A protein has these predicted regions:
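Conserved phosphate-binding loops in N-terminal lobes of ATP-dependent enzymes
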Residues: 1, 95-206, 346-362, 383-390
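Nucleotide/phosphate-binding catalytic cleft detector across ATP-hydrolyzing
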Residues: 1-52, 153-266
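Early-domain small/polar-rich strand-loop-helix modules and first-structured segments
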Residues: 1-160, 306-320
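Gly/Thr-rich phosphate-binding beta-strand-loop-beta motif of the actin/hexokinase/Hsp70
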Residues: 43-73, 255-291
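Conserved A3 ("GATE") glycine/threonine-rich loop of ANL adenylate-forming enzymes
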Residues: 59-61, 246-249, 275, 299, ...
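Amphipathic alpha-helical scaffolding segments
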Residues: 63-85, 180, 184-186, 202-204, ...
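Metal-dependent phosphodiester-processing active-site neighborhood
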Residues: 73, 285-324
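Helical "lid/coupling" subdomains associated with nucleotide-phosphate turnover
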Residues: 238-242, 322-398
Length: 398
């Protein structure tokens, strides 16, 4: 991979005149055979607009939002920014071929928010002191869920899940890779809209379930990722990067995004993939907040991992889901990969539609009833915990 200061005008094509097997043939021993011209890069008029960017780094999914000047926040899409030197055609197979070719780089399609929090390692790692995006790790954007599940057994280029909670030093490095690429692609979208780097500010959320040391490490890694993603050491990261707990962030979403009036008494509960984040308010005053590690993974993913046949029942006659189920069966002896595969599947639109339409049909059967009861028990436990906190606040006359 090479980073250029401007869009290239052409690519020189050369071939090895003598067969060297699988070994690399140096440039001077190759024969130049022609040029491939690139289309002109689009010219963008710079503006003085400001973008406030919010990045929600989630256990299962991550989201990117932006607020331009004083407008309401919007979800940010990563558009297809590949500058192809040829017309990929309109045939479905040709388009699919191009999309598969770019899986290991930047997708040649629109990537909406949220997208799954997954990294992939490369076979041939290009090491760099600053862990630059795309070199040895890149964000694995899930396109076809079946292809993604089929990629799980590949130990040479493993898919990395649970980045948010990996306490190892290598895990923090992977967070930096993920964040740096997210910042880079966000900056590209801003530039395409005429917004300059110096007019960007970044906001990140984190769970209060993090320890103090983990929080410090997360902030340090994330700030470094901003500088790397922007390729700008002069960017005033300390001034232009803010952090807020997920409990407060979700409360602000309800108060401002959903325009819920925070008068009298309000309890917010945000149940995510890895944590449930809670806050209690009275007359717009924050009384209490917390997060704990009881959430979606602990219920749905764990249950399906131990009761795989329920996926088949929910899938009905959907060929894609049934084939995905068979692939999951082939890796069921590896509990970690199986759980990751189920996470991929349940986050697919196909499974979401099947679950919505068919779960009510399977709740009369043993496994379906168990999952429903477990879900109700978990939610009841969260609400019981909240009620205990509320009672304590009342007794303490807070």
């Amino acid at each position: 991979l090479r980073s250029l200061k401007s869009s290239p005008e052409a690519i020189m094509c050369n071939v090895a005149t003598q067969s060297g097997g699988k070994s690399y043939t140096e440039h001077e021993k190759r024969l130049d055979v022609g040029l491939i011209l690139f289309p002109d890069a689009n010219q963008v008029q710079e503006t003085s607009n400001q973008w406030a960017v919010g990045i929600d780094f989630g256990t299962t999914n991550s989201c990117v939002y932006f607020k331009e000047n004083k407008e309401n926040p919007k979800e940010l899409e990563f558009k297809n920014r590949i500058n192809l030197p040829y017309d990929p055609g309109t045939d479905e197979e040709e388009i699919e071929e191009v999309m598969q070719a770019h899986k290991e780089f930047v997708p040649s399609r629109i990537v909406p928010s949220p997208f799954m929090t997954i990294l992939r390692e490369r076979n041939y790692k290009e090491s760099s002191a600053e862990n630059l995006p795309f070199r040895s790790n890149f964000i694995y954007y899930v396109d076809q869920v079946l292809y993604a599940i089929q990629d799980l057994p590949d130990d040479k280029r493993p898919l990395k899940f649970n980045l948010k909670w990996d306490e190892a030093e290598q895990g923090r490095t992977k967070v930096q890779y993920f964040m740096a690429q997210t910042v880079l692609q966000t900056a590209v979208e801003a530039a395409a809209n005429g917004v300059k780097r110096e007019n960007l500010t970044f906001n990140f959320s984190y769970p209060e379930a993090y320890t103090a040391n983990f929080t410090t490490s997360f902030k340090k890694v994330t700030r470094r990722a901003v500088n790397i993603g922007l390729a700008d050491e002069n960017y005033k990261t300390l001034e232009k990067t803010r952090f807020e707990t997920e409990s407060i962030s979700s409360a602000l979403y309800f108060a401002k995004g959903q325009e819920v009036p925070f008068v009298n008494n309000v309890v917010t509960i945000d149940i995510g993939g890895g944590t449930s984040d809670l806050s209690i308010w009275q007359d717009t005053k924050l009384l209490w907040r917390n997060s704990f590690r009881l959430a979606g993974k602990d219920v749905l993913i764990n249950y399906l991992t131990n009761n795989l046949t329920l996926i088949k029942e929910i899938s009905g006659n959907d060929d894609l889901l049934l084939e995905s189920y068979q692939t999951l069966q082939s890796i069921r002896t590896n509990k970690s990969k199986l759980a990751n595969g189920i996470e991929l599947l349940v986050n697919s639109p196909q499974f979401g539609e099947a679950f919505k339409n068919r779960f009510s049909m399977v709740t009369g059967k043993e496994k379906g009833k168990e999952l429903r009861d477990l879900t109700e028990l978990t939610l009841s436990g969260i609400l019981y915990y909240v009620s205990q906190v509320v009672n304590h606040l009342i007794e303490s006359r807070v």
